[in-house]
Amino acid sequence: GPTPVPETVLKAMGRHPIGHRSGEFQTIVRRTTEQLKWLHQTSSDVLVITGSGTAAMEAGIINTLSRGDKVLCGDNGKFGERWVKVARAYGLEVDVVTAEWGHPLDTEAFRTALEADTEKQIKAVILTHSETSTGVINDLETIARHVKAHGTALTIADCVTSLGACNVPMDEWGLDVVASGSQKGYMLPPGLSFVAMSDRAWAAYATSDLPKFYLDLGPYRKTAAKDSNPFTPAVNL
C-alpha cells in the first residue's frame, strides 16, 4: 500500500469540507462507526484517529500499560521491530520472540514464554498480524489463544495490512487491541487510523500511567458516544 483508491471515493473527497461539529458530520460518524464494528467483527467501539497506523498502535500500547510493565513482542519484520522500539521508548520491559524476515513467528515460542510466566508478569503480547515489510501472515488466532490461556495478558495486534483484506474476527479471537490504517484494506488515502479496544483493554486503561494527550483514547471514547471527535479530524477522509 497505499492501495488503489476507487474513483467514487476520490470524487467524494473532493467535496467542500463540512463542519466537524455539524449534525451532518455526526450522522456520517454514526453510520461509519457501525460499519467499522462490522468490519472488525466486534461489539466494541472502534475509534478513529487522524494519523497513521503507527498512531493507532502507539495508542493501543500507551493506553493499556504502565511504566515498567513487562511485554512480549513479536519481531519478524520492520513493523514488529517498530513496536519493540515504541515499547522501549515508554519504559516498558520488553522480551522479544524473533523470526527471520520472510518467515512467520513461531506460535510455540509464545506458548512457552507465556506458560513459563507463572507470576503473571507479562502484561501484554504485542505483534503484527500481516508484516507489511515482507507480506508474511503471522498466526494471530493461535497466538491470541495462548495469551488467553495465560489469563491476564492482553493481545495488542497491528492489523494495518490485514484488516479488510483478511478475516480478523476481533471478538471471536479474543483480541484486546486491534489497530489499522486507512491506506490498506480500506482502500482510502493515508491519513486515518483506527483502534478498537476490548472491555479488558478498557479496564487496563483505568490504571495505565504512561504519558499521553493526543493519543489518550478516553476522550475519543467519550466523544464517540456523541458521534463526535475530541480534535479536528480529517473530515474529507
Identify the residue ranges that each predicted region occupies.
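A glycine-/small-polar-enriched, mobile loop at the entrance of the PLP active site in fold-type I
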Residues: 2-50, 54
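Active-site C-terminal subdomain of aminotransferase-like
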Residues: 4-5, 183-237
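Conserved beta-loop-alpha segment that forms the PLP phosphate-binding cup at the N-terminus of a helix
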Residues: 43-72, 76, 80-85
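General beta-strand structural signal in soluble alpha/beta enzymes
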Residues: 47-50, 73, 96-97, 126-127, ...
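Active-site-proximal loop->helix
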Residues: 82-93, 111
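Active-site phosphate-binding strand-loop segment of PLP-dependent enzymes
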Residues: 104-162
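Conserved active-site segment immediately N-terminal to the catalytic lysine
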Residues: 171-183
